């Protein structure tokens, strides 16, 4: 059967690539994901799955596990998530999770081809979200289409769900809402994030915040007499980077190599000033902070605020302490045991498909796997394609890796759903 499976995957590969192209053509930055969701609906309906649109409120999620809701001006009305599931009654045996939201395509003029016009070059597909993570939906569709050919009754007795969520890139509230409000869950979850065909079993804590700095404003002719708000904000960011080095020394991430940098400080945006010859009176720095897995979000927030206050208090140029506001992620770190049944079975499926065992690793970032693991004690692992330049210019996914990941996923689904419990 497995040779038949690989032949079926090869037969349907081009369909999966065309599906991915359609998804990339539908810009789905946070707040405007519905057009891409409708493409997902059409594809998975064609696979015989039942579709349920899950309403998604733009109101803040009142839950101490939640992140901060995005600004209202980013959000469109009538947002929704989608659960596609195999027909039948009863609970899901397995859930496949993916996120439809993508990050903005900054400076499109720097891209080789427009970010929302998919382009195939040198064995890759380029476009915003092609790798992170619309390529994951192509993997899922390809595996299911091939399995329908070789095992049409595979899901007759047990149900599979494929969940497309939003707000993964800023809060994780999409996955949290799907569980807390709509009860979409299963005993195990596979998230089709890009992992270079490895098993991403863990991630560090991540917090988003805005740091507002105020300073004396005035004519540029007096700029040498005091630091302006932008200068002071840069000192805060550099101070945080030094703080992160000290945190790493005190609290290294044991699941990562010593040479890696898990607690990165990223300055993503700066808003300041209204005139070139005026020293700005205020500046807002949007910063992403990585922190140790063993810290809670509440504890991390306190540590970060204390660090920022300490930097300002030690610098006489600050007229007052910065104002810190949380803006998105309040994500605790997570780790799935690499020897868990989910990890070992998925690794076995990969070994059968490719003759090599996948690398299990922790990344210095976060995924929605943390919500299943930390908040609901559901085993969850990320597995997916080979990505390049995620969040950057000319983001791309290796097309062959979509096929390779589908071969692994299809075997894993056979392991879970064949009535005799056969292993790939």
Name what the model sees in each region.
Residues 31, 123-138, 169, 224-231, ...:
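Short, conserved micro-motifs enriched in small and acidic residues
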Residues 1-4, 11, 46, 74-76, ...:
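Metal-dependent amide/peptide-bond hydrolase catalytic core
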Residues 2-125, 153-156:
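Acidic/His- and Gly-rich active-site-bordering loop/insert found
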Residues 97-98, 164-165, 190-193, 212-214, ...:
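Short beta-strand segments
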